[in-house]
Amino acid sequence: MKESDSVALQSWLSTPNTNDKTHTKADISDDLKILDDETLGRCIIANESIPKDELIMKIPKLYLLNYLNVLKHISYWNQGLNIFLKERISNYSSELFESPQDNITDLYCSIDVQQLLKLTTHQLLTLYLVLEKRRGANSFWFPLLRCLPELPEYDEIPMTWIIGSSDKRATHAKIFNLLPKEVIDESNAQLKKFFKDTTTVDSFFTSRQDLDVNVKEEEYLWAWLAINTRSLYYQNPTYLPVSTTKDKEISSITMVPFVDFVNHKCEKSNAIAKQSKSGYEVTTTAEIGEGEHVWFTYGPHNDDFLQCEYGFSTSTLENDEEDDEALTYTSFNKYNTIELTNILSKLLENPKKKMVVEWLKQTGYYGDYTIGVDDILFDFGSMDMSCAPSHRTRIAIAALIEDEKLFQFSETSQAYQCPQKLEKFYQGYNDGEYYAKTEALILSKILRKIESDLDGKLDKLTEIRNEIDEEDEQSEMKIRVVEKLIWNRKVMILSV
């Protein structure tokens, strides 16, 4: 992004729309500055110290790119949509959303309103971003569109590795298949949603062959990822159909210009963004020193999730200063886990364990088995970490250790009952000392198998690295992403 683009964005937000009689404009603190950081990307820093509880950004509703505003902009050209909004908004006038006529606005004229209102927010915004980008300077949103990342900037999101027409797609697919299973599963789920959304959106163009709107997959992907990575929570008005469907929650999103430059941490944020009556506001939750970044918090998400959704992780793995071939962590995401659900579930699939499974389901302890970080400390450049199985994982292993014949169904209580020792452990009367030794043996066997699989993947990544061209930066970047996610698991195994 050019500096001139960010300047133009702020000018756009700070200049009232000529058709707006209320002269609505954004209010952004002069103490803030957009920075294009080499490692963190676009971000916002403080020019001067900012105190706690300071309102630093106020973006009016007019500049929020969300479901309702898209409908309003299209309604200037579409009579059916104009009527729909007039019936629901008092004194509504589409004149505020006037823009130059072009082939895209001709398409807006003929869009079927009922078909449009069936879209989720993600689908509608994908459709709208693709079309508005084609309008160029004719679009009201032109300053925002110029500041959105280009498609190559999403290259670290794994789902993008097996889509598109890159001449290195075969190599990227090999690298993708070496990702941890959980990341592959999440990426495939994202791809399924992407293709479902774009198929739905594409149906708007099949009936308009007279217009040149042949949308490429890359255009859809750019728009879809922009929305997926840069949206904030936004409660839609209840009079919109999308507010009453099963997609209500996933459709409660908006894009917020300028605010979307704020970077995120898993914890220790210094600002909070929230919907307000006038639009969207950002307030500091701690003092922000001169030169410091403004941070929001993502919440308790592990690196797998962050890599899939946003294309980065919060753990930092670097070459050791004293040994170039050794790797060392300078930060580690405390929400990282080792997934054991598939392995333990397979052990429970034994027909003899049917009563055990029923008891686990009854108590709410069936599934979601992980090893997590107990404690983590960085001291003089080294990381000291301890990891342990979650309580529900320990309960499941204890249930596997017990004789399945001791699990019974009580006709009196109409409930499944477990052995007394397990009942006391489950109820929290002890810490499961009775099972500790056997639990450790089972875990050790499981973790050695996982570690062996991870080492095999690292070996294959080395083979791919040796095969690719030294100047193939795209493939090298993807290899590094996979290596880090694998090493996250390996270092946790060593810390159990």
Task: List PLM regions with ranges.
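Long, positively charged leader/targeting segments at protein N-termini
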Residues: 1-63, 68-71, 132-496
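Eukaryotic helix-linker segments that join adjacent hydrophobic helices
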Residues: 65-146
